């Protein structure tokens, strides 16, 4: 990582942090995350308005993750020599266009095109977010700047689903995306005003990113990452139809459940460093095991609102360990190739999100209401077993 930081500084090293630029990047991150998860809380009205099933509507999440997967792998090589300021502005424009296309969509095809635009911005932005932040502040301030970025992610995850549910009932799902488009416009203007020129640096070295998978335990780790995130999206994408039909929650009740989920996730993220200091492997094996049990409890007793609410809180609290835990594993196990490892990890997560949402939607439409839960629980159990048996820690 130190080599990567040095590579990204060179001639454009600075001595004073550009906090306005850092906060503009953080705001852009928050907007991307919020828009990514809006369909989760708006799935039912979107499906009804477009005349499609909820399982099919859930593919709006799938296509975003699918496009983001490819963007995260190839965007940094494609735009090597391009000024990063213009690239970030482009991503903010794509975010805005995505929201407008979705809000005016009169067909499922147009909805998917809009969500694909978001995927391009999301995957591309995440692939370069760390290096971008490192070029805005002096080396001593990098940890603080990164905490601002990931703090924005945590806040966005807390408010995205409940805010979407509340506003969707108040102004309609299309106007929710119109409001998100306004946020996109604010992103564009803030970035134009605050982000300095950040020239790209063409590289003539051949990238051997996938060679990292040949290292001992790395392939097992990536498979475990895939299964844990696929299990998450198989459940979370369809939390609205499951909770409204299985537990009988209304829109107001669902909003409170989603808010509880988000707050629990924020608390879990805050506690994750304390837990991971004790044992990374225990956290990575224990968290999916708890989630597997939670999925079973919700399948068997989900008609009870108290049980369903409790499962949502436990799920948010526990799954928060997963992304932080795997990032810790990656930086420890592949410290000499942290950027390449991060690129693969982002791609694996987006592929998992794609498959989890797609298969969960198919199961919901063709097998039954609790089938996404059973799929999620099975994947989480397999993750726990794989981590215990095959994943190596340093």
Curated annotation (Swiss-Prot):
Transmembrane segments annotated in the record for this chain: 22-42, 55-75, 86-106, 108-128, 148-168, 176-196, 216-236, 256-276, 282-302, 306-326, 344-364, 367-387
CC per GO annotation: plasma membrane
Catalytic activity: inosine(in) + H(+)(out) = inosine(out) + H(+)(in); guanosine(in) + H(+)(out) = guanosine(out) + H(+)(in)
InterPro entries: MFS (IPR011701), MFS_dom (IPR020846), MFS_Efflux_Transporters (IPR050189), MFS_NepI (IPR023680), MFS_trans_sf (IPR036259)
Ligase recorded as keyword: no
Pfam family, one: MFS_1
CDD domains: MFS_NepI_like (cd17324)
MF (Gene Ontology): antiporter activity; purine nucleoside transmembrane transporter activity
Periplasmic side: 43-54, 107, 169-175, 237-255, 303-305, 365-366
Keywords, comma-separated and alphabetical: Antiport, Cell inner membrane, Cell membrane, Membrane, Transmembrane, Transmembrane helix, Transport
Cell compartment(s), UniProt: Cell inner membrane
Purpose of the protein: Involved in the efflux of purine ribonucleosides, such as inosine and guanosine.
Matching NCBIfam families: PRK10213.1 (NF007578)
PANTHER family: PURINE EFFLUX PUMP PBUE (PTHR43124), PURINE RIBONUCLEOSIDE EFFLUX PUMP NEPI (PTHR43124:SF5)
Protein name as catalogued: Purine ribonucleoside efflux pump NepI
Organism annotation: Shigella dysenteriae serotype 1 (strain Sd197)
Upper lineage: Bacteria, Pseudomonadati, Pseudomonadota, Gammaproteobacteria, Enterobacterales
């Amino acid at each position: 990582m130190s080599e990567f930081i040095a590579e990204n500084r060179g001639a454009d090293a600075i001595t004073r942090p550009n906090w306005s630029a850092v906060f503009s990047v953080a705001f852009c991150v928050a907007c991307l995350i919020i828009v990514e998860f809006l369909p989760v809380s708006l799935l039912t009205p979107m499906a009804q308005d477009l005349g499609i099933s909820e399982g099919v509507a859930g593919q709006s999440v799938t296509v975003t993750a699918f496009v983001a997967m490819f963007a995260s792998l190839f965007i940094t090589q494609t735009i090597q020599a391009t000024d990063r300021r213009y690239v970030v502005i482009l991503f903010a424009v794509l975010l805005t266009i995505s929201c407008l296309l979705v809000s005016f969509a009169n067909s499922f095809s147009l909805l998917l095109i809009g969500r694909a635009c978001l995927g391009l911005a999301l995957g591309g932005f995440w692939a370069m977010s760390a290096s971008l932040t490192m070029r805005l502040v002096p080396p001593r301030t990098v940890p603080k700047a990164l905490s601002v970025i990931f703090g924005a992610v945590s806040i966005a995850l807390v408010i995205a689903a409940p805010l979407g549910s509340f506003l969707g009932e108040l102004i309609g799902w299309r106007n929710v995306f119109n409001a998100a488009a306004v946020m996109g416009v604010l992103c564009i203007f803030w970035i134009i005003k605050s982000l300095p020129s950040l020239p790209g640096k063409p590289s003539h070295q051949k990238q051997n990113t996938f060679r990292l998978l040949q290292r001992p335990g790395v392939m097992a780790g990536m498979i475990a990452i895939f299964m844990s995130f696929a299990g998450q999206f198989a459940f979370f994408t369809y939390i609205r139809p499951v909770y409204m039909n299985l537990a009988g929650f209304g829109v107001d009740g669902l909003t409170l459940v989603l808010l509880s989920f988000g707050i629990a996730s924020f608390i879990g993220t805050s506690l994750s460093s304390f837990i991971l200091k004790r044992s990374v492997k225990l956290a990575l094996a224990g968290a999916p095991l708890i989630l597997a049990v939670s999925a079973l409890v919700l399948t068997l007793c989900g008609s009870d609102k108290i049980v369903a609410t409790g499962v949502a809180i436990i799920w948010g609290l526990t799954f928060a360990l997963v992304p932080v835990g795997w990032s810790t594993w990656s930086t420890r196990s592949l410290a000499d190739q942290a950027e390449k490892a991060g690129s693969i990890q982002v791609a694996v997560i987006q592929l998992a999100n794609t498959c989890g949402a797609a298969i969960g939607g198919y199961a919901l439409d063709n097998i039954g209401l609790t089938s996404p839960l059973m799929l999620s629980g099975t994947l989480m159990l397999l993750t726990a077993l794989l981590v215990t048996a095959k994943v190596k820690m340093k």
